Amino acid sequence: MDRDALLQRYREGPDELEAAVRGLSDAELDYLPRDGGWSPREVVHHTADSELTSAIRLRKLLAEENADIQGYDEMEFSRRLHYRERPIGASLGAVRSSRETSASIVDHLSEADWGRTGTHSESGPYSVEMWLEIYAAHCHDHAEQITRAVQEARQ
């Protein structure tokens, strides 16, 4: 996928995530899939925290030389940040806001900016281009995860 298509997909992510949870009951939001995965509620909060983290990663890549990009423990975030208990509205808003501000930065990147790199603490070399490839799919992947969990819950 070229950059323009990736950026368009990136921009569409919040709409798809919101559509996946629209009209769900608390029971559906809290359904724990048989495969041991997260409930739809937990997925929304994870997506928000990941998007907030991704926004900082983009900014570090662009503003710092050889930026250090930190990984984080997703399971500890889920547990310590009370993913199972919190309402999802603010997290959906955080996803949208993070995406809009980051997309506006990406709209202004030069060719040199696209080549900026850093090092991810878990996966090694990490570039602005890689950032967009990863996060263009992120909301869509989690919307599909939510849809699968809800389908299972309704069986």
PLM segments and residue spans:
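Conserved aromatic-histidine-acidic binding/catalytic patches
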Residues: 5, 46, 90
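Short, contiguous alpha-helical
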Residues: 30-74, 103, 111, 115-155
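Alpha-helical bundle segments that constitute or directly flank the non-heme di-iron/ferroxidase center
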Residues: 1-26, 49-56, 60, 134-137
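Short helix-to-loop capping/linker segments positioned immediately adjacent to catalytic or ligand/cofactor-binding
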Residues: 27-32, 87-91
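Acidic/His metal-coordination segments adjacent to aromatic residues that form catalytic metal sites
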Residues: 2, 40, 77-91, 122-130
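Acidic/histidine-rich alpha-helical segments that form the ligand environment
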Residues: 9-20, 78-115, 135
